[in-house]
Amino acid sequence: MATTTTTTTARFSDSYEFSNTSGNSFFAAESSLDYPTEFLTPPEVSALKLLSNCLESVFDSPETFYSDAKLVLAGGREVSFHRCILSARIPVFKSALATVKEQKSSTTVKLQLKEIARDYEVGFDSVVAVLAYVYSGRVRSPPKGASACVDDDCCHVACRSKVDFMVEVLYLSFVFQIQELVTLYERQFLEIVDKVVVEDILVIFKLDTLCGTTYKKLLDRCIEIIVKSDIELVSLEKSLPQHIFKQIIDIREALCLEPPKLERHVKNIYKALDSDDVELVKMLLLEGHTNLDEAYALHFAIAHCAVKTAYDLLELELADVNLRNPRGYTVLHVAAMRKEPKLIISLLMKGANILDTTLDGRTALVIVKRLTKADDYKTSTEDGTPSLKGGLCIEVLEHEQKLEYLSPIEASLSLPVTPEELRMRLLYYENRVALARLLFPVETETVQGIAKLEETCEFTASSLEPDHHIGEKRTSLDLNMAPFQIHEKHLSRLRALCKTVELGKRYFKRCSLDHFMDTEDLNHLASVEEDTPEKRLQKKQRYMELQETLMKTFSEDKEECGKSSTPKPTSAVRSNRKLSHRRLKVDKRDFLKRPYGNGD
């Protein structure tokens, strides 16, 4: 006679779910039947809680409890786990671990998450949340910074950080085939989805592509919200899977909620922008059928086109940067939603009003803050590593909001009087921008793009050699050219360099290089709050080592220049033996291992 295995599940609350299985492991992956908790006696409930707590402590302290494998996430971060537990709980892990070959018996097994979850990159906190449930059968609250945005006035119930976190855990629950977690998280998401900003609703539709119809209830509710919203058709078409876009159009038609259709001339402008053809846009405007404001072309370019295309369209200065689209968004609001610092700075320089609010009272700064995860914003990056764009946008907008008067960038540039002064200033600014590019790559790329530095010719130390590139195509400026031509080309380079430096000083004050380039007294560089005399001395010594490295490089290049038939006098070194004003090759490691911070 066959033996029937009975499975019971006790749910104590929305955050607890335990399986009490007769004849199977507690962590059996099979689905279970639901029974009221009163079927379990108090001692049984206490025993299950104790077991859950013990297993959760095993996960939270993996090294203490002899974990034997690591899950490697994108970026190299690792989560320790126990193969026996995950193999029993998640069939996908059992299959993946079976294919892993250990090189040595003592070597910890490492499993790449991308080999299991191939279609979407998930964060550390999402992985920990799902694996904690696998161990304990209990849904734990995520760390505050993992599902909270930067805005202190936000309740963090339905902001973008919360949406991103929920999408990630829903995806992992689907990939790991944990049906009970799929149900729990979908139910939680349905409780908050009505509070989500309509632009963030579009993010949820990723689940359709990733998980098919697994989250049909959630996706159907999102479709209902989008149908009744005023979001533009062009945004829907570019953001949604084609079948969902068509479904929304059909429902709107049935409910007589169709928005006005775009005119043919506006569509042509959008097509030209999609093709990154700003020249074609100019030709279409000459026909006189419409203009950039009537077509909301700048809004479209900022939202959907390449950064260069949007920047080139803005540089035409044919559109009102403070114009609101039918949904009440200015161009700056749209740039904030995109979290692109170059576009935000460009708009501010063109006169965009940072204090303009959306119809629901959000400024551009609030928009960016609610799109940026708190953990990402609070995590400081080391010099030389890329900064996150969300944090840069917040930095720019916060600084700009404090300014009472925005002086023109060009006002700080006084033209050099003599060729020697021009050469000295070029060498100084080339040095400064090169160092900034080394230490703050994203910030420098942002401001030098606005200053159009790449459109000018770099001035290098080799340009000082009289016989440089004789008989070859010139790739940098040559001082043997006619004086007027030299002066004009160098002035263009100097203007771009100065504008790059001034933009960096204005919008990224923490990236100041004054303590490298212009310090007359090293004592003030070493004087930092909470420093000890020993630390100040160490900093001062390290600074002197850097100067010696740079001076040694200069001396070697000077000897090479001296071998030429017509040596030229040089003033590349200040009389006080400060940093040499020339374009130098510097080792990134020399700066990354210095003991002091960025400072102003």
Curated annotation (Swiss-Prot):
Q: Where is this region: Disordered?
A: 554-600
Q: Where does salicylate bind?
A: R432
Q: What is known of its domains?
A: The BTB/POZ domain mediates the interaction with some component of ubiquitin ligase complexes.
- Keywords on record: ANK repeat, Cytoplasm, Metal-binding, Nucleus, Phosphoprotein, Plant defense, Repeat, S-nitrosylation, Ubl conjugation pathway, Zinc, Zinc-finger
Q: Which SUPFAM superfamilies match?
A: Ankyrin repeat, POZ domain
Q: Under which pathway is this protein filed? A: Protein modification; protein ubiquitination
* Domain of life where this protein originates: Eukaryota
State any GO BP term from the record: protein ubiquitination
Q: What is this protein called?
A: Regulatory protein NPR2
Family stated for the protein in its record: Belongs to the plant 'ANKYRIN-BTB/POZ' family. 'NPR1-like' subfamily.
Residues with the modification Phosphoserine, per the entry, are: S15, S19
Q: Which gene encodes it?
A: NPR2
